[in-house]
Amino acid sequence: MNKIYLIILALLSSFSLYAQGTDPQAKKILDGVNGKMKSFKGVTANFTITSVSSKGRNNGNRTGKVSIKGQKYLLKQDKVEIICDGQTIWNFDGAKTITVSSVEESGSTLSPQNLLSNFYDKDFTYRLIGTKGNFHEIEMKPTDARKNFQRVNVFVDKNSSLITKARILDKSNNTVEFTLSGINTNAALDDKLFTFNKARFPKDVEILD
């Protein structure tokens, strides 16, 4: 589930992945999202995640909040917390373990930093599925077959040029859909928000790096 959280951050952030075999219409839309996000100093949003098994069983909803400022981000969902100061990532599992990794170490994963830079021009192929109502739907498939998901369908609001929903299909044909709401693109976020403070976590927490 933590990988899904990272995708949420990535899609909400200044979009920059890189793709091969691109659809010009889809690229124009994604470029618009990228440019729009880069103009914001701080972004906050609420999210709802709904997961459905390959057999169609609804596994329930999860809700949380994300805050993003440039390369820094904070995600909270119940007791789970992921903090990044732009160089280091602290991932608290909500119990007694914090896993520490560097942004560089996450270079081969679907992390916000990778998605923050132009993922739709190298790491994905993508095409515009269609436009319905106020939304463009774009299908994105990873060029690396080792990724643990088959595709991501993103829904871009035509009026705001923001991604407000995404549907992820994994290798086991399970689906995870998340919806963003209450998006604030003019959030004043203090850098302290993205600073790791061990005192905020359980005294017996184990830190793995």
What is the predicted function of each stretch?
Residues 124-209:
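Gly/Pro-enriched, hydrophobic low-complexity segments
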Residues 49-51, 80, 93-94, 167-170:
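Beta-turn initiation residues at beta-strand->coil junctions
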Residues 63-110, 176:
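An acidic-aromatic
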Residues 15-57, 71, 205-209:
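N-terminal leader/targeting segments and the immediate start of mature chains
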Residues 7-16:
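Bacterial N-terminal signal peptides
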Residues 104-134:
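Flexible, surface-exposed loop/linker segments and immediately adjacent secondary-structure boundaries
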Residues 1-4:
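Positively charged n-region of N-terminal signal peptides that target proteins for export
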